[in-house]
Amino acid sequence: MNLRSVFTVEQQRILQRYYENGMTNQSKNCFQLILQCAQETKLDFSVVRTWVGNKRRKMSSKSCESGAAGTVSGTSLAAPDITVRNVVNIARPSSQQSSWTSANNDVIVTGIYSPVSSSSKQGTTKHTNTQITEAHKIPIQKAANKNDTELQLHIPVQRQVAHCKNASVLLGEKTIILSRQTSVLNAGNSVYNHTKKSYGSSPVQASEMTVPQKPSVCQRPCKIEPVGIQRSYKPEHAGLASHNLCGQKPTIRDPCCRTQNLEIREVFSLAVSDYPQRILGGNSTQKPASAEGTCLSIAMETGDAEDEYAREEELASMGAQITSYSRFYESGNSLRAENQSTNLPGPGRNLPNSQMVNIRDLSDNVLYQTRDYHLTPRTSLHTASSTMYSNTNPSRSNFSPHFVSSNQLRLSQNQNNYQISGNLSVPWITGCSRKRALQDRTQFSDRDLATLKKYWDNGMTSLGSVCREKIEAVAIELNVDCEIVRTWIGNRRRKYRLMGIEVPPPRGGPADFSEQPESGSLSALTPGEEAGPEVGEDNDRNDEVSICLSEASSQEESNELIPNETRAHKDEEHQAVSADNVKIEIIDDEESDMISNSEVEQENSLLDYKNEEVRFIENELEIQKQKYFKLQSFVRNLILAMKADDKDQQQALLSDLPPELEEMDCSHASPDPDDTSLSVSSLSEKNASDSL
């Protein structure tokens, strides 16, 4: 039982800061952050990892309570944002409406908006103790008779704010981490939003969007509207100011020009997106939020505390394909909304020629700018369709023509619920790296373990080519990658070696469960005697190969894959070829069984014979004991008669000698009677002294 860890105030502050900067789950994507945090706090790695898990559960339980009060509102907003540590920059041309929701439920911001007098917030425009990061201006081709606008969020860097909760907001293709404050904020730490929106012909006046001084009960909740329904904004209720996309910085207007401002009290995020980059200028159809999106998502998971750990084990191995600081998410309902991009009528919505800005072209904030990452469509991680920046219509994108269209990539049916969570702060976990750091654990069910052990008993005990057919067969049966099966075999071999158990020799060919696996394991080596040393060398070599294969790149795995049709034909051929071998093995098994049975019978007969000998010796011992007692009584009586000098008694005893003495006298006649009498007399004296 582990003891509870007591953290100091400084350690709590460091842990909270790392949590805000992306250390939000226990997978390998946060391994570097957890390691750095452990070194900085001088705590053990497992202690920090346990703290992250406890933090996730606490935030998930709180989000379930607070998520029920939130309402779903808004339409679509597409923004490829760049997540840089401690700084969030958003720059996106958008002429849609000003709600915080993207096309495929990427971001559903539910908030409590209350009017606040603008005079009380004038002091917040000074930016005294804050660092406001300005987003990059992205030039976009303008369509005729259309207004292109730019949305800019200026979010201050707050490094030492106690008790912050992260609300992850997905906008477009990347992830923005907004901090939801529960402590009192000063006037300088404010979030400013200045844009310029033009809906039809009526401009929207400038206003200010600030974080409240203190969390309080809402005074006027926002209007509840279903997702996907266009909402007309009146000028007096709009909270977004704007400026043209000409490269100039946004002008902060006097907030006194407005009678009231909007104040954000709560920000929630529902991570139920599939392909955020498919949002082209807001021309998309949104579906109502499903039941999965009722909880706040912490660290880009489903928000379901019961299913969290099971999903994390499945998702951890997929993070190796993401090539920058990003988090992508997908769920089963997002696959149903893949190709439903339509044009919705409405003011500011008709932008058929709006372009997709690829995240790779923003060179100031993207890591690994000089490298070009090409991902293979078929990898063992099954994440090609969710890790590529693909577009629904390739002709609309002039920035990334080499990326594969999302129409060409599909997830298989058994991978609908797979999600990807990745914060790649280290370059060796990228998709093009030679090795994958920190191979994650695979949790098998009881049925899968029984299947693996059944194949193990049938001869799938080697990592070499001799067991390739069995490995492929069990991988297809369990619907897992061959590398996972090879890793399991290598781990089991090491376990056997550590426990002192001899690893069974491997058997080639397809698996055959018509016989007992133990009986065929020894006879599989009899057809070729020279196969013995090769198998031994293969066993020694496999222990090293098991480690290498578990870290091999996905490109090497894809080269080893065999199509199912050719694999089926190959299995049939091997079954036809190895039929004679199976018969020979059965005959050898019968002979070995006969030999073993005869040996057992021989040992049993030998044991019975030994038992008879023991019983015979025991009977002989009893007979000898009786003879000894008779001789002892005869000698005693004879000695007493000799001492009493009773001739008659002596003659009577000598006339009635025991038969043993008579036989002894006849067979052992002493040539010297004096010696015999002397020996008898000495024996009688000794017995007499013993009796006295």
From Swiss-Prot:
One of its GO terms (cellular component) is nucleus. There is a cross-link at K137, K142, K146, K165, K174, K196, K214, K223, K234 (Glycyl lysine isopeptide (Lys-Gly) (interchain with G-Cter in SUMO2)). Keywords: DNA-binding, Homeobox, Isopeptide bond, Nucleus, Repeat, Ubl conjugation. Residues 117-136, 505-541, 647-692 are annotated as: Disordered. Residues 3-63, 437-500 bind DNA. InterPro entries: HD, Homeodomain-like_sf, POU_domain_TF. GO terms for molecular function: DNA binding. It is found in: Nucleus. CDD domains: homeodomain. It comes from the Eukaryota. Residues 117-133, 676-692 have a biased composition (Polar residues). This is Highly divergent homeobox. The gene is Hdx.
